[in-house]
Amino acid sequence: MPSPADHAPEHVRRLGKVHHVALIVRSIEDASRFWRDALGLELEAVQDIPQDRVRIAFLAVGESKVELVEPTDDTTGVARFLASKGEGFHHVCFEVSNLAETLLRLEIDGLELIDSAPRRGAEGPVAFIHPRSCHGVLVELIEAPGGPSWESLGFPPHG
């Protein structure tokens, strides 16, 4: 049976590339040594994300990235995930052309969203879809560089 969102424009119904795969780690320094030294990935950046109480690192691999996520506060969801499941896979992130329109379509389709509107992420506007709607997988969406949410969230113009 067709969804009400089936009439959405093509750019709202299609995902772009895999932006990154995120891994929860105890130590970015230890984990990045493996990914950089053993597998040859290039470390792009390490940064603190105070609002999420994590430290992250991005390592380039082809047109995508591996994101290492280290909790900086033992009371966060990321810290609880690490304590209960250990290091490993956390989420996959897909690029979309218009995040707000995509979230609206997903909501119309009945998916459970963690973020109902774009919010500021490390590399652009982001939102998460709850694992209950994704067969147990946490899915992040990131708006493509220069998309409509960039300016409203205070990101610089992307050229």
Segments (PLM) and residue ranges:
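Long, hydrophobic N-terminal alpha-helical segment
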Residues: 2, 6-54
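Vicinal oxygen chelate
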Residues: 2-12, 25-33, 57-58, 67, 72-73, 84-159
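Short, flexible, solvent-exposed loop/turn segments with mixed acidic/basic and small polar residues
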Residues: 10-12, 79-85
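Short, structured motif recognition centered on aromatic/hydrophobic residues
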Residues: 18-25, 35, 59, 66-69, ...
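Short loop/beta submotifs within extracellular cysteine-rich repeat domains
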Residues: 31, 42, 66, 74-77, ...
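Residue-level structural signal for beta-strand termini and adjacent loop
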Residues: 49, 71-72, 144
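C-terminal "cap" of GNAT-fold acetyltransferases
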Residues: 49-65
